[in-house]
From Swiss-Prot:
The keyword Nucleus is annotated on this UniProt entry: no
Domain TTL: 571-930
Coiled-coil features, chain-numbered ranges: none
Pfam families reported in the protein's UniProt record: TTL
Function of the protein: Probable glycylase which modifies tubulin, generating side chains of glycine on the gamma-carboxyl groups of specific glutamate residues within the C-terminal tail of tubulin.
Source superkingdom: Eukaryota
Gene responsible for this protein: TTLL3D
UniProt biased composition (Basic residues): 151-161
Molecular functions per Gene Ontology: ATP binding; protein-glycine ligase activity; protein-glycine ligase activity, initiating
Organism, as annotated: Tetrahymena thermophila (strain SB210)
Entry EC number(s): 6.3.2.-
Lineage: Eukaryota, Sar, Alveolata, Ciliophora, Intramacronucleata
Protein name: Tubulin glycylase 3D
SUPFAM superfamilies the record matches: Glutathione synthetase ATP-binding domain-like
Length: 1034
């Protein structure tokens, strides 16, 4: 029993040791696999929460990976220590068990020599109850046999039998004891051999465990060393970066200085080259002048010699055959009449023409030289700007993006910025505005979506979150600004101008209609027909005065037009009484009359044919690959023979022109006197309408209207038409919201080109309203010369820079060299040369300022006023031949690009002056400085043209000013003194009062019953009878 238990314990110990060996045989691959699984689980848990931060900030991810590795290593070390402790405890237990087993074997070996009581004590110590009981049972039998005193008394008859049995039993027991002793000795020998084998195995296992522990210890130490090495490497990298930063700053400074020196040297060399070129050009000009003078003298001499030879030959022929020559040839007669002074005049004319041509060529050369010099100066300025930008960037501190911080105080602490510093955000370019703010010590926030800013300048109003803006943050857009910036919003807001000022909309804004509104569409059709009638009358009168035979063809058309216009513009008070006349008045133009007026216009069939032929042309051009190009005209040189003919022809024509002028002057006098009754009526009507209608001069002979999409800019989708059918068809075909506006047919032209004026306006507040006018504008020209024959050519009718820059121009003049633009000074000089005084400053500019005020006042109720908001607007204005300005549109976020040299200078100045107004003047005004000190602060070229009063409760369409009452004085006589009333008079008065009260009560009851009936009729659907009855009642 004891041996079996011992063997079972040994087997259990071996299994536990094998399991421990397997658990401690750890490789590097197992550790790496566990580490990867652990990191994957850790990342999967937190990936959705912190993914956007890890993408933007990879440094955070690296730091967290380091922390994860350190935690994993710490846990691994703890596990190793715990396994060590478990292993040590198990080893101790095994040693104790082995000692106990050895002690047991020793006890069994000495059991033959020991007494029975000692054997029992040993067994009791080892807690072997089952063995103890078996031994006690054997001993009880022995005691009964060997010790009779403990035995019970028995019968005498059985004594003999017991004695024999006793002897037999003793012999058998002794034999058994000997056998047991021999077996026990064999078992003890076997146990000793097994114990020695087990001890040898334990020693081997202990040595293996010690090797595993040493490996683990070495591995942990190696990991610690790696961590230390990484930390040391990171510290070394930090030190290197700090040293590299200091070195890079010094290198940048040295690099900038070297660049500056190189650029200065290049500029010096370039200036030397320019000086040499200028000297060479002067010498060449002198030589050319000398050659020109010599050529002129040679031409004069040659021409005079040839003329003298011709005259001498002609005189000889005249003297020989005087009569025959006069009868046959008329050329000789004309040559005879030519005298020497006339020849000299013709020569001077030819020489002047040559001079003009030479001067034009010189001007072209000088303009090209000036352009070359300007381009060189431009390059110098750009290089200087680059150097300044590099130096500024080296000084400016680069900030980190912090997307999850909303408070300004925390953001400044994280960026390590002082609390007093001002922060701005700029979106969409605007480099000059950035420079202006950086000069003033502001700091740029690179994160455009951040709520941490003091000023934000954006291209679009969508980029501003109006719901979450703080009241002290400055923004460059107003909410709901479409009431002034969109074409439909401007139209609707200008209709309410009479609530704010005594100004007529028709004096500065051409007629405009919304094609999507049915009422306005009908008004447009009516106004188109009326303006067509006016154009017919103008055309008829012009043809009649020019004595063109075509005026008889359009006389019927003019008679109908005059009839229509006189009926329409007749006083409505004379027409309203007669129902027939009233219906004709409101109908304005019947269909029969319109057919006569629109006889020269396009019908629906003609429009379909036109579209068909246009598609066929497009298909042919696409198939053949033909491209239409503008033909370049080349100048041809004139020979001496051509000059001679021109001289003789000009001398002959002068006499003929003088005779014709005398005849024409006599005829014109007769025309003024002799005029038909119809034409005189037309003339009188047109003169009356010119006085009454402020837009009379805009209506020309062609009746052109311009169609615009309401939401597009830069000339996109704009077309011009003069046929009603085409306008309606175009408006229906477009899915966008369209607007129709009267085309200005009498614009001022400069060198046969149409132009408009771009003006910048700044609004800093709506309550109280503050308007700033930038006192320098620029002019934008069309790319081609103006004509109304081809309305599809956008280069003739549109002045947007986005369109004109696409035109490939062949020749160059002052306008094209400047990018189809003029400065304000050039415009003023043009008016001084043509009109003799500065028309822009004296007449046009005051009207433009009034237009700006009226347009902004008209929408002051609809635009949401917010403190610390401002906006820059771009006004487009055109001028007619009477020097009246007309408002075309108002733009938000006007283009501030360097499209030309003119815009480059002005854009820089505008953005710098905006910073002066908003930052310098605005911040000083908020601080509560006196007005005298505020006036000293410079605002550049921005002038305040309007400062309104603050309104606490602004109502919709509130009356602002100019409520006028008119009338005449009245004489009121004093009432006569009445006599005292008697008793009868009092009774009569009481009766009258009672009757009046009864009538009032009766009327009130009737009124309440009528209201109840009306409510029932509105609530129920009316039948045909009830509708007729209600109409009769009304």
């Amino acid at each position: 029993m004891i041996n079996s238990h011992h063997t079972s314990q040994q087997t259990l110990n071996k299994e536990s040791k094998s399991q421990m060996d397997k658990s401690y045989n750890i490789d590097d691959s197992i550790v790496d696999a566990k580490f990867e699984n652990y990191t994957k689980k850790y990342q999967d848990d937190k990936l959705n929460k912190i993914l956007h931060t890890y993408i933007k900030n990879p440094q955070i991810l690296m730091d967290e990976e380091k922390e994860i590795k350190e935690r994993f290593l710490a846990k691994q070390m703890k596990d190793v220590a715990a396994t060590k402790q478990k292993f040590d405890t198990k080893n101790k237990l095994q040693q104790l068990e082995l000692e106990n087993e050895n002690s047991q074997n020793n006890s069994y070996k000495t059991s033959n020599n020991l007494s029975k009581e000692e054997v029992i004590a040993v067994l009791q110590k080892q807690n072997r109850k089952s063995q103890v009981n078996s031994v006690l049972a054997d001993n009880s039998n022995i005691q009964n046999d060997f010790y009779p005193q403990y035995r019970k008394p028995k019968n005498p008859t059985t004594k003999k039998r017991q004695s024999t049995d006793y002897t037999k039993r003793n012999t058998f027991q002794l034999e058994n004891l000997n056998i047991q002793q021999q077996l026990n000795n064999k078992d003890s020998l076997n146990q000793q051999n097994q114990q020695q084998q087990d001890l040898a195995k334990n020693r081997v296992d202990n040595s293996q465990n010690q090797d595993i522990q040493a490996r683990l210890y070495e591995r942990t130490e190696l990991q610690k060393l790696r961590i230390k090495q990484k930390e040391e490497e990171q510290a070394a990298l930090k030190n290197k970066r700090q040293t590299n930063r200091s070195q890079s700053i010094e290198q940048n400074v040295n690099f900038v200085q070297n660049d500056n020196q190189k650029l200065i040297d290049r500029h010096k060399e370039y200036l030397k080259q320019l000086k040499q070129q200028v000297t060479i050009e002067k010498e060449t000009q002198k030589q050319l002048k000398k050659k020109d003078e010599e050529n002129k003298i040679r031409l004069r001499n040659s021409v005079l010699a040839s003329i003298k030879n011709d005259l001498t030959e002609q005189r000889k022929l005249i003297q020989e055959n005087h009569n025959l020559f006069l009868s046959k040839s008329t050329v000789s007669q004309s040559a005879k009449q030519i005298s020497l002074p006339e020849i000299n005049q013709s020569l001077t004319i030819c020489l002047e023409k040559q001079k003009s041509e030479v001067e034009q060529e010189k001007k072209a050369v000088l303009t090209s030289q000036a352009f070359f010099r300007q381009s060189s100066l431009r390059e110098i300025e750009e290089t200087n700007e680059k150097i300044e930008s590099k130096t500024n960037l080296s000084k400016v501190k680069k900030l980190r993006p912090l997307p999850f911080i909303s408070s300004m105080v925390e953001w400044k602490k994280k960026q390590r910025i002082p609390a007093d510093s001002k922060i701005f955000i700029v979106m969409g370019g605007y480099k000059d505005f950035k420079k202006a703010l950086l000069k003033r010590g502001w700091i740029e926030n690179p994160q455009t979506n951040s709520p941490c800013f003091d000023l934000k300048w954006t291209l679009l109003g969508k980029d501003i979150d109006y719901d979450n803006i703080l009241p002290n943050q400055i923004v460059n857009h107003f909410e709901n600004n479409s009431k002034i910036c969109s074409k439909i919003g401007l139209l609707n807001s200008l209709k309410n101008l009479y609530w704010f000022d005594n100004a007529d909309l028709n004096c500065f804004f051409p007629q405009c209609f919304d094609m999507n509104d049915p009422d306005e569409f009908n008004d447009f059709v009516k106004n188109f027909k009326l303006s067509k009638a006016v154009s017919v009358l103008k055309k008829y009168l012009r043809l009649y005065l020019e004595k063109d035979e075509k005026y008889n063809n359009c006389k019927i058309q003019a008679q109908v037009a005059l009839q229509v216009l006189t009926r329409y513009y007749n006083d409505i008070n004379n027409v309203i009484d007669d129902e027939k006349q009233a219906s004709e008045y409101f109908k304005s133009i019947p269909d029969d009359e319109w057919e006569i007026l629109a006889s020269d216009e396009m019908s629906n069939e003609d429009l379909a044919k036109k579209k068909h032929f246009e598609w066929i042309k497009k298909i042919k051009l696409a198939y053949q690959g033909i491209k239409v190009k503008a033909q370049v005209k080349k100048k041809k040189k004139k020979s001496l023979a051509m000059i001679k003919k021109m001289i003789s022809n000009e001398a002959i024509k002068r006499k003929q022109d003088g005779e014709k002028q005398q005849i024409d002057s006599s005829d014109s006098e007769d025309e003024e006197v002799e005029m038909d009754d119809f034409t005189s009526a037309v003339n009188q009507f047109l003169n009356q309408r010119e006085k009454c209608d402020p837009q009379f001069n805009l209506k020309g002979e062609d009746n052109i209207w311009i169609v615009k999409p309401a939401g597009l800019s830069r000339g996109r989708g704009i077309t011009c038409y003069k046929n009603l059918v085409e306008i309606i068809d175009h408006a229906k075909s477009m899915e966008l919201q369209m607007i129709v506006q009267k085309y200005i047919e009498n614009p001022v032209l400069i060198k046969q080109r149409k132009f408009d004026i771009r003006i910048w306006v700044l609004v800093t507040d709506w309550n109280p309203l503050a308007i700033w006018y930038f006192d320098e504008c620029y002019v934008r020209f069309s790319a081609d010369s103006y004509s109304t024959k081809n309305l599809s050519n956008k280069f003739q009718h549109l002045t947007n820079n986005a369109i004109s820059k696409k035109k490939a121009q062949q020749g160059q003049d002052e306008i094209t060299l400047q990018g189809n633009m003029y400065t304000q000074e050039q415009l003023e000089n043009f008016f001084i040369e043509t009109e003799g005084y500065n028309v822009f400053q004296q007449k046009i500019k005051p009207q433009i300022i009034n237009i700006i005020k009226w347009s902004i006042l008209s929408c002051s109720d609809t635009v949401e006023s917010r403190k610390n908001s401002m906006e820059l607007f771009g006004y487009d204005i055109m001028i007619d031949t009477n020097f009246n300005p007309w408002l075309l549109e108002v733009n938000t976020s006007p283009s501030l690009e360097y499209s030309t040299e003119i815009t480059k200078k002005l854009v820089k100045q505008v953005l710098e002056d905006v910073a002066k107004v908003v930052v310098d003047y605005g911040m000083a005004q908020k601080s509560g400085i006196k007005k005298s000190e505020l006036q000293k602060i410079g605002t550049g070229k921005f002038i305040k043209i309007y400062q309104g009063l603050e309104i606490q409760d602004k109502g919709i369409n509130s009356i602002q000013k100019n409520f006028i009452c008119e009338g005449s004085k009245m004489k009121i006589r004093k009432p006569k003194k009445q006599k005292k009333n008697t008793k009868l008079d009092k009774k009569q008065n009481l009766q009258q009062d009672l009757t009046i009260n009864n009538q009032i009560n009766h009327d009130q009851k009737q009124f309440s019953s009528q209201q109840a009936n009306n409510i029932e009729t509105y609530s129920r659907p009316q039948t045909a009878k009830s509708q007729t009855q209600s109409s009769k009642k009304l």
